Amino acid sequence: MQLSDIFLRLGEETFQQLMHSVSMGRLRTYQLFDRMKARLHLHKLNSETLRKASPRLWARLGEHDDEFATDLAQAILVSHLDMIKAVLDHLGVPHQDGFFAKDTDVSNYLKDGWQSEVWEKFRAAFPPAALLFYINHLAWEVAKAEDVFAPAA
């Protein structure tokens, strides 16, 4: 499974919510603002232009451009570092402000059922779309998941 598959399987509505949650301040803090502006082909990057560009960005994800998906994921994840830190702390995963140390194997911290457990614990505290994306991103990145986690309705 590729990163673009996570976006596509979560659906366009979830993608729209994720785009609305991107923090311009965090993009600037982590020096991603100019890179994102260029990758998204936007002359001006702000919440409104990002929202308006979402249908076009969704179409680009459908082309399975994994570099593009990686850049989008990075923008989304840095916008939700408080959530990431809370989830990693809950799972007991060692991290530095939400980031893993280089060459660290954290897969042994992800026990059976961790996705449902994290969803139930944090879904009321954080935006559901961002939490669902992070759960799937973590599973893909660390556990090499081949399927997308979707909580029971």
Regions found by a protein language model. Name each.
Residues 1, 149-153:
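Short intrinsically disordered terminal tails
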Residues 1-34:
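Short terminal alpha-helical segments
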Residues 24-143:
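Acidic, low-complexity, intrinsically disordered interaction modules
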